[in-house]
Amino acid sequence: MQTLFKFFKKYNSLSLEAEKAIAGISKIIHIKKNTDLQAIGHTCKTIYFINSGLARIYYFKDGTDITESFTFENNIVARIESLFTGKPSRKAIQILEDADVVAINATQLFKLYNKYPEIERLFRLIFESAYVDTVNRIEGIQFHTAEERYKTLIKEAPDVIKRVPLKYVASYLGITQVSLSRIRSSK
């Protein structure tokens, strides 16, 4: 749990009492590679912190597997739209490497907001950051070429090529594997 609380400190400090409250609604789980942490059609009720390993969010469009995002160690992953609306998600969270994950019960977490305003502030800041990342991702698709998106990905996550199957990287970039190979060989 210490890694989780270190991550939280990047956003907002918590009192020891607030940390204990979060620890009380969290559990550490081990997930095997290629397992869906949350399946398509599931209503999200858990916020996950990746202690070790790697996850991706994906969905199917016209029968094609599309990768929306990757989440590396020391970061949060959840289906936020499902979490806040209470509706089943059309996307899944898949573990790409054996992973140790902290699962935070979101229903219980939200109940802590009134008692611990610092927890509410913490998660507001985390969700704001996730929103900004989403906007940046959308703008990357709208305004940048595939090669520029690839360079940005390598700059932000240099290990992605070593750790993620190229079909998922290509899908994330919105290109075919052949196009990704061309971009990589032109370097």
Residue ranges and their predicted role:
Residues M1-K27:
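Cyclic nucleotide-binding regulatory module and flanking cytosolic helices
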Residues K27, L54-Y59, D100-V101:
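Short beta-strand segments in beta-sandwich/barrel cores
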Residues N34, K45-R56, N74:
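Glycine- and acidic-residue-biased ligand/ion/polar-headgroup-sensing regions
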Residues L37-H42:
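Short phosphate-coordinating micro-motif centered on Lys-Gly-acidic
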Residues T67-L125:
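Cyclic-nucleotide recognition modules
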Residues A130-E139:
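Short, Lys/Arg-enriched N-terminal segment that forms or immediately precedes the first helix
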Residues H144-K187:
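Phosphate-/nucleic-acid-contacting segments
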